[in-house]
Every structure is written in C-alpha cells, then in structure tokens.
UniProtKB/Swiss-Prot annotation:
Protein known as: tRNA (guanine-N(7)-)-methyltransferase
Gene3D superfamilies linked: Vaccinia Virus protein VP39
Entries under InterPro entries matching the protein: SAM-dependent_MTases_sf, tRNA_(Gua-N-7)_MeTrfase_Trmb, tRNA_methyltr_TrmB_bact
Lineage: Bacteria, Pseudomonadati, Pseudomonadota, Gammaproteobacteria, Pasteurellales
NCBIfam families for the chain: tRNA (guanosine(46)-N7)-methyltransferase TrmB
Organism whose genome encodes this protein: Haemophilus influenzae (strain 86-028NP)
The EC number(s) this enzyme carries: 2.1.1.33
List of residues binding S-adenosyl-L-methionine: 77, 102, 129, 152
Family that this chain belongs to: Belongs to the class I-like SAM-binding methyltransferase superfamily. TrmB family.
Residues the record lists as binding substrate: 156, 188, 225-228
Active site, renumbered: 152
Reaction catalyzed: guanosine(46) in tRNA + S-adenosyl-L-methionine = N(7)-methylguanosine(46) in tRNA + S-adenosyl-L-homocysteine
GO molecular function: tRNA (guanine(46)-N7)-methyltransferase activity
Biological function: Catalyzes the formation of N(7)-methylguanine at position 46 (m7G46) in tRNA.
Length: 246
C-alpha cells in the first residue's frame, strides 16, 4: 500500500538527536506511540485538510497572525486525544485561536474530521512532540493559555519521571505565556493532581486562582471529556487546577 502523508506523519513526531560521537540520544518521553491504526476516513481527512487545519514542526516560531488571520489569543492544548472537547471549545469561543498537539495520528485524524464537520476555522493541529514545539516553534510570550487535560498519569512510582508536569516543563510553558496567560490542568488521578499542585505552586511566576489554594470545580467552559466520564465510572475524583501568570 502506498504510504500517504498521514501514514508518514506518525514516523516524524519527534526530531532525532545525537551525542557528539554520533550515538542516538535517548529521551525521557511523556508519551508512548501506540499502534492504533488510522481508519481510511481519518487518513483521508488528514490528507485532504492538513493544508488548512494542520501545522508542521519548524525550527523558527510560527507567525500566528498570518496563520489565523487575526491577533486573537492563542490557547494551546497538549494531548487532545480524539479532539472532541478541543473542537467544541474552539466552536464555542470564536474570539480565541486554538492550537492542539497530539502525537497519535488516529486522534489527529478524528479531530480534523470533527472540526470540518463543525465548520471550525480558529483551530490548528500539530502531530509532533509538544516539548519540541514549545522549544522551537512558539515564540516567548506568544500564548494566551495552556490546557492540559487528563495527561498520561504514569501511575507506577518508577515511571513518575515520565509525567509531563515537571518543574522544567512548567518553566518552559511560562516562558511562552504572555502576561496574565493561564495554565489549566485536569486529572482523574489524585496523586498526579497533588504533583501538579506542588509543581505549579512552587513557581513564583504563577498565581493559583483557587480560593482554597488548591483545586477549582470544573468550569463550565471545559467540556466533560470521555476520560473524565471514565474516571467517574471507576470511582475516581477529578481535579482541576487553574493558575495565572503574574
């Protein structure tokens, strides 16, 4: 079978890095590339609509005003899954521009398909490692906010180093946020919620909007996700955190 653009995309979600003596440098990644296959429909949606809804990793900052055709705030969501809640938020907030990052191509294809169905134009998606996008493709101060909903909890203690929410990640995000930019996280793992709260609270550039100094109720503007519904079924709680850059 001929390899299409969508098929090739899965193989280029991160840039290979090497040591000075030419050996491949292993990275501690917050994601694992699952083997889920693109459906024919998802493949076609990616191939047909990438030019209008997709962005590729680049080593210089995106020109968001040119990409979106306006200067509306940019809200970045990392790990949007199948993309339904992201598209719903973009549809409900035409005064904001949304940028979604997801490394799993079936999710990217599904997100694009739903965006086309809803007629959403204020959304772009990227299929690449988020840490590289933050490092290379987004200018300092360019973002209005970051959304991180139900990231992989890596629940085993020996895997906690793989969790995306680490001090260096938060520092990197803050650098990309403009003044009063927000960080909104949600998880259905209490241990991860505690880690998120600890890491975010330790950064003096952020202010917690919770009146109690911890978590907030799910705001109406965040759609109920399938991961959240799954958590409720398993008897898990759900914790939202909302911090603002000083």
């Amino acid at each position: 079978m001929t390899q299409t653009f969508a098929d090739q995309k899965r193989k280029t979600v991160e840039t290979a890095e090497f040591t000075e003596d030419g050996r491949y440098k292993r990275k501690v990644r917050s994601f694992v590339l699952r083997t889920g296959r693109l459906s024919e429909f998802q493949r076609n949606m990616m191939n047909d609509n990438w030019g209008t809804l997709g962005l590729d990793y680049q080593t210089e900052p995106f020109d968001f005003a040119k990409i979106y055709g306006n200067d509306n705030p940019i809200v970045l969501e990392i790990g949007f899954g199948m993309g339904k809640s992201l598209v719903d938020m973009a549809f409900a907030n035409p005064d904001k521009n949304y940028l979604g990052i997801e490394v799993h191509t079936p999710g990217v294809g599904a997100c694009i398909a739903y965006a086309v169905e809803k007629g959403v134009t204020n959304l772009r998606v990227i299929c690449h490692d988020a840490t590289e996008i933050l490092r290379d493709s987004i200018a300092d101060g360019a973002l209005g906010g970051l959304q991180l909903f139900f990231p992989d909890p890596w629940h085993k203690a020996k895997h906690h180093k793989r969790r995306i929410v680490q001090p260096h990640f938060v520092t990197q995000v803050i650098q990309k946020l403009g003044k009063n930019g927000f960080i909104h996280m949600a998880t259905d793992w209490e241990n991860y919620a505690e880690q998120m709260l600890e890491v975010l609270s330790a950064n003096t550039d952020l202010v917690n909007t919770s009146k109690n100094g911890d978590y907030i109720p799910r705001p109406d503007f965040r759609p109920l996700t399938k991961f959240e519904a799954r958590g409720y079924k398993l008897g898990h709680g759900v914790w939202d955190l909302y911090f603002v850059k000083k």
